[in-house]
């Protein structure tokens, strides 16, 4: 009989409304304010943004205005972890509404720090602890209610079938009514509420051990036999249900109104409690939900509850006949009832009763006993009497539990004065700490927090008071850690929150080492204030700031952000540049350590010296290594070049075929036979020859075995220049070179010179454009070499070559041409044959920096056929590193005529540049003139475009030839203009023009030394 009466009492009493589970929503619909958007994408809707709340992230409608962060303690973090593990093990995800509801309830207990805007300069004042206390009491009461409904659901189903139960009939009518506007998210049925409520919503206490039959799962997964209480007799159960039905039938219906106690009222709650964003300095007042469940019941309801308690007190014998399971359920229901009444009394008044003037937490139960939060004294007296009756009934129930040896449920410890204990341990074994953690310093804290809600002792004379004292003795005793507390700490448990801290042997201190030694105290304090400002923490958090040489040390006190010394050190490293810019100091080192270790920090000067020494050592080693590598590389290059030179020379010394040698010697004899025998010889031939050869790199090497003696005749240079003329020309050249302004003006005048006529229409024809290597150097129409079209492979008379006249306009002295292209090689050899040339001067390498300068128009060995001209390589002689000499055997296959051609190839002159030394080029010119002497045919001179290097060589040779013939006046600028009248672009740069003047002066000086004094 007692158990059904208790259930009816639970329905009549107005405990704090439990948070209802959200109504079933289709899985695809996005609910506002969903949690977990930082961990899973796609939770927020199109008009929502994910706001970082410090835990999982919460969706808010754009623009987001409610910015706050949860303050998560280690105990709360463990509770969240357990809840997530249970949800995951059951198969729920962040998309499920049940997961959202459970985690929202878990986060409701956590204090918050509100921000003015997302980038707030400092944290707002956290929400008052009274709000968290209010929600905690609500959860504990809700836990008891949920367990009671789960265990006694069959009794409620049986009661729903009793025709005499007017109260339950009204409950069904309330369930069948359509939902009111704004309440569509909440269930109107007790069974629906229980089906959506899980044990996961209410975490067990710290010392609770859940039995295996209470593993986390939803009620819908339980079987009917698990929901039914295990009673010994079904007859006894029917007696209990019948008695409860009869009692409910005798109870008159309560009038609707503010104090309505219908089951529908128990399940009403607002869709979302409004949370205005207040200033941190203003205490937050939380409005009550719709149909405020915290309002006390009416006087008539209190009288009926009082009568019900008396009925329960008159039937102790029947209560002693209940089973263990029923007694356990009654204990849980009474615990939840008392907690709901305690909580209702504590939260009845405005915020002034719960919050003191200093913003600290007030003692809710004491405030309730003082009557500060009850607007109606009469109602308060009824509640007090009702509370005392519940105490006496609990004492009787406690005796029954002692007789049966029943164990209290982990979720319901609360007979009158619930005692909750939280343990926070941050101890770790010494062996598990790494060296880095030891250096940083580990705060060894072992704390035990006791929170005890004290209720004032009201005088009463009922006999149940003694029984209640016995019930207190039957509560679980304190743990070993509780018993180990000092006596003073145990006596002070009633004062509120107690913290026992076991400090570490030596407190860890943070330090920041700067480049300033010694560091002034005000600079050290300013640096610490900059760190505090960076972390948005008050400067008072940093205690015991000291300056040790170049370092500043500090300790981090307790703070609401739970920032430790190691966190400060890490933030300093991450924001090093910003701190250096703000403080004007250079941060060299940061860390955490004991004060004794900080005193032995190495002086900064020694660190800098060691760093400099290491850097200098590394630089020295690198230099030594570089020198060794360079020396080895140079040696290898020289050795390989000498080896290649020896191989090439030995290859040149090998005899070619007998036919080629015999043919070449026969050609040389024919050439000597046609030479006129009566050439005059100068009187000083040998002397001038010896003086001219003094600029060579060494003694003149003898011709190779593949060369004929007739090709290298030692005919002397004819010179008619006297001493006075030579000195006058030399002084003119020296003055020209020393006067840079004069040279500059002369070159500017040459650049402005325009040749007349200067038409190049033939070179610009469509069929001739591919035959030009450079479009900047095209032959003039009036001055170009004409080929015989009938002998040309392209039947064209065009080739990019210009005849250069000296004193005789009928016989050109030179032919300046471009380097042959693959398509113009046959034209080049045709020009050589038709012009009767026997000397070719080549002034460019084949390739420069990967760019082709000239085509390889001769065979490397043997012979090649170019149209009707067969070219056979006879010899190749390397005179020095700067030039070499090749001899070719040229044959016209149409006429079977043959001719010898000698090529002088200068290797060290690059495009738009000058040779490294004029001496090598002058020696090269002497070799060319010795071979050419006595010939009336022109010399073919080519480089890449046939203008820059070719023009410089022709200018030097032409001026020196004029002086050798006894010219009294020399005008190099006028000579260059004469060359540009015949081919454009001759001598392309000022450096090339200056080089020509230098070469002429050096050769004149050599001639003067050779003349008789």
Curated annotation (Swiss-Prot):
Site (Cleavage) location in chain: 425-426
UniProt key word rRNA processing: no
Residue ranges of every copy of the Tyrosine-protein phosphatase domain listed in the record: 743-1003
Disulfide bond sites: none
Annotated catalysed reactions: O-phospho-L-tyrosyl-[protein] + H2O = L-tyrosyl-[protein] + phosphate
Classification via SMART domains: PTPc, PTPc_motif, RESP18
Topology feature Extracellular, residues: 20-613
Positions of region (Involved in localization to secretory granules): 1-419
Gene3D superfamilies named in the record: Protein tyrosine phosphatase superfamily, Protein-tyrosine phosphatase receptor IA-2 ectodomain
Localisation per UniProt entry: Cytoplasmic vesicle, Secretory vesicle membrane; Cytoplasmic vesicle, Secretory vesicle, Synaptic vesicle membrane
Glycosylation sites: 562
Posttranslational mods: Subject to proteolytic cleavage at multiple sites.
Bilayer topology term: Single-pass type I membrane protein
Subunit annotation: Self-associates. Interacts (via cytoplasmic domain) with PTPRN (via cytoplasmic domain). Interacts (precursor form) with CPE. Interacts with HAP1. Interacts with AP2A1 or AP2A2 and AP1G1; indicative for an association with adaptor protein complex 2 (AP-2) and adaptor protein complex 1 (AP-1). Interacts with AP2M1; indicative for an association with adaptor protein complex 2 (AP-2). Interacts with MYO5A.
Name this polypeptide is given: Receptor-type tyrosine-protein phosphatase N2
Organism: Macaca nemestrina (Pig-tailed macaque)
